[in-house]
């Protein structure tokens, strides 16, 4: 955990090699790349978000690698990436705490979104408004799927105090 603008953020230790104190880069970052909000999927993959500076703009991606660092796939998002994401049980759907539909979509940060991956692109659908203030770490939505993938659970301080909310993923 820490800042995303570091030379190398994601590391792994392979205990099978017998060198438990030797950390190696899991995903080698290049100049102009940053990654953050790493998580293990229920399928055993590692999901994360990446920003890549390209032709004067920043492109946001959802990415997946194996625990040995083998690159699996990446998906370009249509606008700013969500702050936090999680995958459903079979990695076919991602829940995110913003739903930007275009690079200039300023309202998107107030929405929970469902993201499907098709042909190298993230297809964003807004699920519901969370309207959190983002003032504290506790007020960040940090969305997750319920074990049966039917519900999206998230936090918000929209009512004046942080509460946990549920939205029916099957409603859209």
Enumerate the predicted regions with their spans:
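Blade-terminus and WD-like Trp-Asp/Gly-His loop motifs, strongest in beta-propeller folds
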Residues: 1, 37-47, 85-94, 144-151
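Short loop/turn segments immediately following the C-termini of beta-strands
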Residues: 1-3, 51-53, 99, 157
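Structural motif
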Residues: 3-12, 56-64, 103-113, 160-168
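Beta-rich catalytic cores
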Residues: 6, 34-36, 58, 81-83, ...
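Surface-exposed loop/turn elements that mediate protein-protein interactions on large endomembrane-trafficking
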Residues: 12-22, 61-75, 115-125
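Conserved blade-ending motifs and adjacent loop-strand segments that build the rim/top face
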Residues: 27-30, 73-86, 121-145
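Loop/turn-rich, solvent-exposed surfaces of beta-rich toroidal or solenoidal domains
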Residues: 49, 58-60, 75-121
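Blade-level signature of beta-propeller repeat domains, shared across WD40, Kelch, NHL, RCC1
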Residues: 139-172
């Amino acid at each position: 955990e820490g800042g995303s603008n570091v030379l190398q953020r994601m590391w792994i230790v392979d205990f099978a090699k017998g060198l438990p104190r030797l950390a190696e880069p899991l995903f080698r970052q290049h100049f102009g790349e940053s990654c953050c909000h790493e998580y293990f999927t229920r399928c055993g993959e590692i999901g994360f978000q990446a920003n890549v500076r390209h032709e004067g703009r920043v492109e946001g991606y959802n990415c997946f690698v194996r625990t040995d660092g083998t690159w699996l796939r990446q998906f370009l998002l249509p606008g700013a990436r969500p702050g936090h994401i999680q995958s459903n049980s079979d990695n076919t759907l991602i829940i995110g705490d913003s739903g930007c539909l275009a690079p200039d979509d300023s309202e998107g940060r107030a929405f929970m979104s469902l993201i499907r991956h098709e042909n190298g692109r993230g297809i964003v659908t807004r699920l519901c408004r969370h309207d959190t203030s983002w003032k504290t770490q506790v007020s960040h939505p940090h969305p997750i799927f319920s074990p049966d993938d039917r519900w999206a659970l998230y936090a918000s301080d929209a009512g004046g105090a942080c509460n946990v909310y549920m939205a029916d993923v099957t409603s859209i």
